[in-house]
Amino acid sequence: MRKTIYLLLFFFFLITSCSEEKTDFILKGQISGLSSDTLLVYYQVPEFKLDTIFCQEGKFEYSIRPDTITMFSLIFSSEESLPVFADKGQTVEIKGSTTDFEIQGKGENKLMNEIFSLLKATPEKNIRQVVDSLIQTNYQSFTNLYLLDKYYVNQEHPDYNHLKKLIESQSGIIKDTPYMMLLQPKTEDLANENSSPRVVN
Protein backbone atom coordinates (compact mmCIF):
# COMPACT_ATOMS: atom_id res chain seq x y z
CA MET A 1 0.00 0.00 0.00
CA ARG A 2 2.80 2.38 0.97
CA LYS A 3 4.64 1.63 -2.32
CA THR A 4 1.48 2.44 -4.24
CA ILE A 5 1.17 5.81 -2.50
CA TYR A 6 4.82 6.62 -3.26
CA LEU A 7 4.31 5.70 -6.91
CA LEU A 8 1.22 7.89 -7.12
CA LEU A 9 3.09 10.80 -5.54
CA PHE A 10 6.00 10.29 -7.93
CA PHE A 11 3.75 10.41 -11.00
CA PHE A 12 1.90 13.43 -9.58
CA PHE A 13 5.12 15.43 -9.21
CA LEU A 14 6.30 14.25 -12.62
CA ILE A 15 3.11 15.44 -14.32
CA THR A 16 3.17 18.71 -12.37
CA SER A 17 6.76 19.47 -13.34
CA CYS A 18 6.00 18.77 -17.00
CA SER A 19 2.96 21.03 -16.96
CA GLU A 20 5.08 23.84 -15.48
CA GLU A 21 7.50 23.80 -18.39
CA LYS A 22 8.87 27.29 -18.98
CA THR A 23 7.22 28.96 -21.95
CA ASP A 24 8.23 32.60 -21.43
CA PHE A 25 11.04 34.24 -23.37
CA ILE A 26 13.05 36.71 -21.29
CA LEU A 27 15.29 39.45 -22.64
CA LYS A 28 17.66 41.18 -20.23
CA GLY A 29 19.72 44.15 -21.29
CA GLN A 30 22.19 46.77 -20.17
CA ILE A 31 22.84 49.27 -22.96
CA SER A 32 24.80 52.51 -22.64
CA GLY A 33 24.32 55.51 -24.88
CA LEU A 34 20.53 55.31 -25.19
CA SER A 35 18.97 58.62 -26.19
CA SER A 36 15.79 57.88 -24.24
CA ASP A 37 14.51 55.74 -21.38
CA THR A 38 12.11 54.08 -23.84
CA LEU A 39 13.08 51.54 -26.50
CA LEU A 40 10.87 50.91 -29.50
CA VAL A 41 10.29 47.21 -30.25
CA TYR A 42 9.47 46.38 -33.86
CA TYR A 43 8.09 42.87 -34.45
CA GLN A 44 8.72 41.28 -37.87
CA VAL A 45 7.97 37.56 -37.37
CA PRO A 46 5.37 36.05 -37.22
CA GLU A 47 3.56 39.41 -37.64
CA PHE A 48 4.21 43.14 -37.78
CA LYS A 49 3.50 45.07 -34.58
CA LEU A 50 5.06 47.59 -32.21
CA ASP A 51 5.78 47.63 -28.49
CA THR A 52 7.95 49.58 -26.05
CA ILE A 53 10.44 48.75 -23.32
CA PHE A 54 11.10 51.11 -20.42
CA CYS A 55 14.73 51.32 -19.30
CA GLN A 56 16.25 52.51 -16.06
CA GLU A 57 19.79 53.81 -16.53
CA GLY A 58 20.11 51.60 -19.60
CA LYS A 59 18.90 48.44 -17.84
CA PHE A 60 15.73 46.60 -18.80
CA GLU A 61 13.96 43.26 -18.72
CA TYR A 62 11.33 42.27 -21.25
CA SER A 63 9.34 39.04 -21.43
CA ILE A 64 6.84 37.57 -23.87
CA ARG A 65 5.18 34.18 -24.32
CA PRO A 66 5.80 33.20 -27.97
CA ASP A 67 3.73 30.49 -29.64
CA THR A 68 6.43 30.04 -32.26
CA ILE A 69 9.82 31.57 -33.02
CA THR A 70 9.40 35.35 -32.96
CA MET A 71 11.70 38.01 -34.36
CA PHE A 72 11.74 41.61 -33.20
CA SER A 73 14.22 44.46 -33.34
CA LEU A 74 15.22 46.94 -30.67
CA ILE A 75 15.35 50.33 -32.40
CA PHE A 76 18.22 52.43 -31.04
CA SER A 77 18.10 55.11 -33.75
CA SER A 78 17.17 55.59 -37.40
CA GLU A 79 20.41 53.82 -38.34
CA GLU A 80 21.02 51.35 -35.51
CA SER A 81 18.87 48.40 -34.47
CA LEU A 82 19.39 45.01 -32.87
CA PRO A 83 17.48 41.90 -33.97
CA VAL A 84 16.34 39.47 -31.27
CA PHE A 85 14.94 35.98 -31.79
CA ALA A 86 12.49 34.79 -29.13
CA ASP A 87 11.71 31.13 -28.53
CA LYS A 88 9.91 29.34 -25.71
CA GLY A 89 11.78 29.05 -22.43
CA GLN A 90 14.90 30.89 -23.57
CA THR A 91 16.69 33.79 -21.94
CA VAL A 92 18.86 36.24 -23.87
CA GLU A 93 21.16 38.88 -22.41
CA ILE A 94 22.48 41.94 -24.23
CA LYS A 95 25.35 44.07 -22.94
CA GLY A 96 27.25 46.97 -24.45
CA SER A 97 26.39 50.19 -26.24
CA THR A 98 24.04 51.07 -29.08
CA THR A 99 26.85 50.54 -31.60
CA ASP A 100 28.92 47.79 -29.97
CA PHE A 101 27.10 45.04 -28.11
CA GLU A 102 27.32 41.36 -27.19
CA ILE A 103 24.40 38.93 -27.36
CA GLN A 104 24.39 35.96 -25.00
CA GLY A 105 21.92 33.30 -26.04
CA LYS A 106 21.28 30.15 -28.02
CA GLY A 107 20.30 29.29 -31.58
CA GLU A 108 19.60 32.29 -33.80
CA ASN A 109 20.77 34.75 -31.12
CA LYS A 110 24.12 32.99 -30.84
CA LEU A 111 24.46 33.02 -34.63
CA MET A 112 23.58 36.72 -34.76
CA ASN A 113 26.28 37.50 -32.20
CA GLU A 114 28.82 35.52 -34.25
CA ILE A 115 27.77 37.43 -37.38
CA PHE A 116 28.21 40.79 -35.63
CA SER A 117 31.68 39.75 -34.43
CA LEU A 118 32.66 38.60 -37.93
CA LEU A 119 31.43 41.78 -39.61
CA LYS A 120 33.15 43.94 -37.02
CA ALA A 121 36.47 42.27 -37.88
CA THR A 122 35.91 42.50 -41.65
CA PRO A 123 37.41 45.38 -43.67
CA GLU A 124 34.77 47.71 -45.08
CA LYS A 125 35.61 46.83 -48.69
CA ASN A 126 34.88 43.13 -48.01
CA ILE A 127 31.66 43.52 -46.02
CA ARG A 128 29.28 42.91 -48.93
CA GLN A 129 31.14 39.77 -49.99
CA VAL A 130 30.99 38.36 -46.45
CA VAL A 131 27.30 39.24 -46.09
CA ASP A 132 26.56 37.50 -49.40
CA SER A 133 28.28 34.37 -48.15
CA LEU A 134 26.42 34.45 -44.82
CA ILE A 135 23.03 34.86 -46.49
CA GLN A 136 23.57 31.98 -48.90
CA THR A 137 25.21 29.67 -46.35
CA ASN A 138 22.58 30.21 -43.64
CA TYR A 139 19.63 30.10 -46.04
CA GLN A 140 17.29 28.77 -43.32
CA SER A 141 18.18 31.43 -40.75
CA PHE A 142 16.00 34.36 -39.69
CA THR A 143 19.21 36.39 -39.28
CA ASN A 144 19.05 36.88 -43.06
CA LEU A 145 16.03 39.16 -42.67
CA TYR A 146 18.28 41.60 -40.81
CA LEU A 147 21.18 41.23 -43.26
CA LEU A 148 19.02 41.67 -46.35
CA ASP A 149 17.30 44.72 -44.91
CA LYS A 150 20.45 46.47 -43.68
CA TYR A 151 22.91 45.72 -46.47
CA TYR A 152 20.67 45.56 -49.54
CA VAL A 153 17.23 47.10 -49.05
CA ASN A 154 18.23 50.19 -47.07
CA GLN A 155 20.83 51.39 -49.54
CA GLU A 156 20.78 54.55 -51.61
CA HIS A 157 20.94 52.55 -54.86
CA PRO A 158 19.89 48.92 -54.21
CA ASP A 159 20.99 46.26 -56.68
CA TYR A 160 17.59 44.66 -57.25
CA ASN A 161 18.87 41.96 -59.58
CA HIS A 162 21.35 40.75 -57.00
CA LEU A 163 18.81 41.10 -54.21
CA LYS A 164 16.39 38.97 -56.22
CA LYS A 165 18.98 36.17 -56.50
CA LEU A 166 19.66 36.27 -52.76
CA ILE A 167 15.96 36.07 -51.96
CA GLU A 168 15.56 33.11 -54.31
CA SER A 169 18.34 31.27 -52.43
CA GLN A 170 16.38 31.32 -49.16
CA SER A 171 14.39 28.43 -47.71
CA GLY A 172 10.60 28.34 -47.73
CA ILE A 173 10.31 29.18 -44.03
CA ILE A 174 12.20 32.45 -44.62
CA LYS A 175 10.30 33.33 -47.80
CA ASP A 176 7.00 32.81 -45.95
CA THR A 177 7.69 35.54 -43.37
CA PRO A 178 5.57 38.72 -43.70
CA TYR A 179 8.67 40.80 -44.47
CA MET A 180 9.79 38.57 -47.35
CA MET A 181 6.27 38.21 -48.72
CA LEU A 182 6.24 41.99 -49.16
CA LEU A 183 9.84 42.30 -50.32
CA GLN A 184 10.01 39.50 -52.90
CA PRO A 185 7.33 40.66 -55.38
CA LYS A 186 8.47 44.28 -55.12
CA THR A 187 12.09 43.25 -55.76
CA GLU A 188 11.11 41.09 -58.73
CA ASP A 189 9.17 43.97 -60.29
CA LEU A 190 12.05 46.41 -59.86
CA ALA A 191 14.61 43.87 -61.09
CA ASN A 192 12.55 43.20 -64.21
CA GLU A 193 12.10 46.92 -64.76
CA ASN A 194 15.85 47.51 -64.57
CA SER A 195 16.52 44.58 -66.92
CA SER A 196 14.04 45.71 -69.57
CA PRO A 197 15.64 47.29 -72.66
CA ARG A 198 15.12 51.03 -72.85
CA VAL A 199 13.82 52.56 -76.04
CA VAL A 200 15.80 55.63 -77.06
CA ASN A 201 13.89 58.14 -79.16
Model-derived regions: residue spans:
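Sec-dependent bacterial lipoprotein signal peptides
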Residues: M1-T16
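A non-transmembrane, solvent-exposed segment enriched in polar/low-complexity residues
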Residues: C18-N138, F142
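Canonical tetratricopeptide repeat
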Residues: N109, N144-L145, M180-M181
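Alpha-helical repeat scaffolds
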Residues: N126-S133, Y160-Q170, S196-N201
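Short solvent-exposed coil/turn linkers within tandem alpha-helical repeat scaffolds
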Residues: T137, S141, I173-M180
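Amphipathic alpha-helical repeat scaffolds of TPR domains
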Residues: Q140-K150
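Short coil/turn linking the two alpha-helices of tandem helical-hairpin repeats
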Residues: Y152-H157
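N-terminal "domain-start" segment that seeds a small globular fold
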Residues: L183-N201
